[in-house]
Amino acid sequence: MARIAGVNIPTAKRVPIALTYVTGIGHTSAAAICEAVGIDVTRRVNELSDAEVLAIREHIDANYAVEGDLRRETQMNIKRLMDLGCYRGLRHRRNLPVRGQRTHTNARTRKGPAKAIAGKKK
């Protein structure tokens, strides 16, 4: 199994599909990486030489924020919004939808399970 950015990528899959197992690399980025390194998109990971895997690893390290770094950057951006006290930061702080969705009904994913209110039965 090849390790790229700390992730064991599957060897039986095609290279662009296997690269999407790394957080921060989607289909478009994976295809761009293959093109930049000069690897055919129809090849499978187990057909790659060690030099090709190393070239992919170096290209990703140089040009992409992936895995822990990407998660840390996202969390720092959210923390910055919360510290600023802007509207988006307040919505994050209160665990409510941030992008303008309605909350009178719905928004259960963000708000969590419904809380029972005493004296509501009749």
Curated annotation (Swiss-Prot):
<keyword id="KW-0689">Ribosomal protein</keyword>
<dbReference type="GO" id="GO:0003735">
    <property type="term" value="F:structural constituent of ribosome"/>
</dbReference>
<dbReference type="GO" id="GO:0019843">
    <property type="term" value="F:rRNA binding"/>
</dbReference>
<dbReference type="InterPro" id="IPR027437">
    <property type="entry name" value="Rbsml_uS13_C"/>
</dbReference>
<feature type="region of interest" description="Disordered">
    <location>
        <begin position="98"/>
        <end position="122"/>
    </location>
</feature>
<dbReference type="Pfam" id="PF00416">
    <property type="entry name" value="Ribosomal_S13"/>
</dbReference>
<dbReference type="InterPro" id="IPR001892">
    <property type="entry name" value="Ribosomal_uS13"/>
</dbReference>
<dbReference type="GO" id="GO:0006412">
    <property type="term" value="P:translation"/>
</dbReference>
<comment type="function">
    <text>Located at the top of the head of the 30S subunit, it contacts several helices of the 16S rRNA. In the 70S ribosome it contacts the 23S rRNA (bridge B1a) and protein L5 of the 50S subunit (bridge B1b), connecting the 2 subunits; these bridges are implicated in subunit movement. Contacts the tRNAs in the A and P-sites.</text>
</comment>
<dbReference type="InterPro" id="IPR010979">
    <property type="entry name" value="Ribosomal_uS13-like_H2TH"/>
</dbReference>
<dbReference type="InterPro" id="IPR019980">
    <property type="entry name" value="Ribosomal_uS13_bac-type"/>
</dbReference>
<keyword id="KW-0820">tRNA-binding</keyword>
<dbReference type="GO" id="GO:0015935">
    <property type="term" value="C:small ribosomal subunit"/>
</dbReference>
<dbReference type="GO" id="GO:0005829">
    <property type="term" value="C:cytosol"/>
</dbReference>
<keyword id="KW-0694">RNA-binding</keyword>
<dbReference type="InterPro" id="IPR018269">
    <property type="entry name" value="Ribosomal_uS13_CS"/>
</dbReference>
<dbReference type="GO" id="GO:0000049">
    <property type="term" value="F:tRNA binding"/>
</dbReference>
<comment type="subunit">
    <text>Part of the 30S ribosomal subunit. Forms a loose heterodimer with protein S19. Forms two bridges to the 50S subunit in the 70S ribosome.</text>
</comment>
<protein>
    <recommendedName>
        <fullName>Small ribosomal subunit protein uS13</fullName>
    </recommendedName>
</protein>
<keyword id="KW-0699">rRNA-binding</keyword>
<keyword id="KW-0687">Ribonucleoprotein</keyword>
<comment type="similarity">
    <text>Belongs to the universal ribosomal protein uS13 family.</text>
</comment>
